[in-house]
Amino acid sequence: GVTISHLTVERFAAPHDEGVVNHDMADGWVIEHATVQDNSGAGLMAGARQRVRASCLRNNGQYGMNAYKTGDSIRGLVVEGNEITGNNTDDWERRRPGCGCTGGVKFWAVDGADVRGNWVHRNRGTGLWADNNNNDFRIEDNLLESNDGAALMYETSYNAVIRNNTIRRNNWVEGRAYAKDGDGFPYATVYVSEAGGEPRIPARTDRIEIEGNVLEDNWNGITLWENADRFCNSPANTSTGYCTRLVKDTGRCARPAIAAEPLYGDCRWKTQRVDIHGNRFLLDPSVVGCATECGRMAVFANEGTSPDWSPYKGGRVAEAITHRQQNRWHGNVYRGPWSFVAGDGSRTLDSRQWQGTPYRQDAGSSFGPRAGG
């Protein structure tokens, strides 16, 4: 493989969704003690067994790194000890609304990644975004701060450990903009969207474990979400042409087979087996600059409405994510005026309601009125 060390790569032009360093997504590259800055597109692409260490990915037009490889064959990726800052200078979400194509690092169909000891800050959009059939991630000992959007999104993916990260002052820009527009969705700092633990898919864990993190003065906390209308073969599946890791042939996810197990369960990405414990959630609204629209934790789904043949219509998915998919907060510390959203999104709960029936969340957790401590 190629090693790039102690080199500055700057002011190159890559097209949208392409990158400058390792443009052809070759395997086995090592990038260390490098500065990759002020390029258009992504600063880096990625291949299998790539190591990105002690480098600065700064002020690139779209991503710091786009961890996507044609054929979805990235395995064993390491991103360690880097500064990842100021990326998406070309503001692609404004140029292509809803593209989901920006951030510090975007991971796509990566099987096995260690993301540790990075400083991910002041990116325009999401800090770290794992989207579409990623699996077996360890995201540990990072400082994620002051990103315009979520610090971390784990979406339509599987099996991750998110541990011992410091996550502060994220999502102020996007959270405030949504609130100003009257959008009440609890846009999260750690956003788990149609992603969960799956024992049938080999990994170092069979859950999504969120433990030992400090979340301080972010717009919101952790949101566990499912879009009831997003599943294989549905128009609401934005990962066009993809199905879950459990179903190889997307065409099987259709009537009548999808209405019964195993396809009823396996044709959708499920937020399940998420274990949130031993975290500190600190909120001072005077620091964040918000009132009632911030400081929320959430586990919920929308009502299923489409397509016509969907077996997930009505409140089935909301009931499942809230009560039957082993999503559990426990043993956490809260300081500040936190509130909670559960079920179908229409209910905002205080800590007593959240801990009481029927939700029974945050057993063994402590709640206090002030941030800090």
Regions found by a protein language model. Give the residues of each.
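Extracellular parallel beta-helix/beta-solenoid repeat domains
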Residues: 1-373
